[in-house]
Structures are given as structure tokens and as C-alpha cells.
Amino acid sequence: MASKHRYYNRAHGYVAWDYAYNMLNSCEPNGIIFTNGDNDTFPLWYIQEVEGVRKDVRVVNLSLLNTPWYIKQLRDLRPTASEYNNLIQEREGNEIIGQRFIKIGDGDIKDITNGLTRWKTRDVTFPVQSDQQITWSVKPTFAKQALKVQDMMIMQIINDANWTSPIYFAVTVSPGNRIGLENYLEMEGLAY
């Protein structure tokens, strides 16, 4: 076993670090990037939390986005410094309440994560600026009859961000998980 040690030594393995660095630097300041799962999320979290790289980018793991605990964690995260500066300085006692990353209550989270949401293909419209909007078709993503929790939450996050943060999908996110937004996505580095 000791003779094979050199094959398993990761001392100079920079793939995960380089991947994370390049992925985060594909995003504009204060961006939100949706990642596919553990293998493409953990390197980003590591480089942000341990190395301090691009902590302004909010990383959202689509696999975990199907769980109530993760949705609550995202909702309750303290804002990044740049988000904090953009908050409406509303106070309740000594606490700044301003805006949250996700603006839904526990009851709404329970409703969304309680099961699949029956869905027929329909157009979804979000305002972009005061006089403009984007419209795209959202098709059922589960058994051609329902939306997954992550799909509902992608729409919720885009709506709640109110176009104050650029939205990205990692290159590892399959087209089926981009909720029909392909016509509005453009590849920039390792993100759409």
C-alpha cells in the first residue's frame, strides 16, 4: 500500500481550487450562482470561506435547494458586505431587518417543500425595469406533470433578487435545471 502512495497524493492537485476560483471569477460582483451539486459546490464554498475569495458571490446548490433546512439557511444568512450596504436601513430595536436573500416565511417554505407542485407549461413573466419585463416558458420538470422544489425556488430567488444581483448557472447545471431560461443566458467563463 505504501508503494501506491504517490498515486493518491494530492499535494499538488489544484484542479478543485482552480475550478472554484475560475467559476467565482466568471461572475460579476454580488452575483448569485446556481450550482448543480456537491462536487461543484464544495470547492466554491471552501475557497470563499477558507481562502476569502469572492465572498460577494452567493452560491446556491440546486440539490440542497430541495430541502427546507437549506432554504431557511439561505434565507437567514447574514448579508454580504455589499448586500448590507444596499439594504434599506429599517430597524426594529437594534436589529436591521431590511431585506433578506429569500423573502418567504416558514409557512411558505413548508408549503413549497411539502411535495411536488403540479404544473402545466406556462409563461412566467418577471419585471426587469419599471417599463420592461422578460417572459419565458417554464415546463414541468418532474414526470412532465410537476415542478421540483428547486425550480420553484429558482423563480423565488430571481424574483426576490429584483435584478439587483446578476444571476448565473454553473456550466455543470444541465439545461433541464435552468427552468427554460436558455434564451436569456450567455456563457461567461464557467457560468451562464
Predicted regions and their residues:
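Phosphate- and divalent-cation-binding pockets in alpha/beta enzyme and binding domains
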Residues: 42-46
